[in-house]
Amino acid sequence: MSMSDPIADMLTRIRNAQGVQKASVVMPSSKLKAAIAKVLKDEGYVEDFSVQEEGGKAQLTIGLKYYAGRPVIERIERVSKPGLRVYKGRSDIPHVMNGLGVAIISTPQGLMTDRKARATGVGGEVLCYVA
């Protein structure tokens, strides 16, 4: 069975794993998922991530991060969906929780946070919000 929205599946796996205090979560890998994991690591929301080949299929492993027994990621939600894409110009890029969270944006220069997109002066597809 094909997956209609692999990014939503990734975010749901992270949300569910943190809900039961898992140390890490494993999922099928893709270039886009690895790029999202890199942004999450750079922003300090996850410990680390790695991509391994298992039986001809690439698997993405994300090490989850906790502080005082609570997940560092309080909220992670998909914004642009396959049925309703959400694009924002450089002047319309949203602030997540007044700057306390980040929006991950797919731009012509690659994936980046809302802050970096504003600084670079580019817009793009708003993939998800993380807080």
Curated annotation (Swiss-Prot):
Stored Pfam families: Ribosomal_S8 (PF00410)
Sample GO molecular function, one term: structural constituent of ribosome
GO biological process, one term: translation
InterPro entries, alphabetized: Ribosomal_uS8 (IPR000630), Ribosomal_uS8_CS (IPR047863), Ribosomal_uS8_sf (IPR035987)
Keywords attached to this entry: Ribonucleoprotein, Ribosomal protein, RNA-binding, rRNA-binding
Keyword set includes Ligase: no
Segment forming the signal sequence: none
Keyword ATP-binding: no
One GO cellular component, as annotated: ribosome
Function of the protein: One of the primary rRNA binding proteins, it binds directly to 16S rRNA central domain where it helps coordinate assembly of the platform of the 30S subunit.
Family: Belongs to the universal ribosomal protein uS8 family.
Quaternary state and interactors: Part of the 30S ribosomal subunit. Contacts proteins S5 and S12.
Name by which UniProt lists this protein: Small ribosomal subunit protein uS8
Organism field: Cupriavidus metallidurans (strain ATCC 43123 / DSM 2839 / NBRC 102507 / CH34)
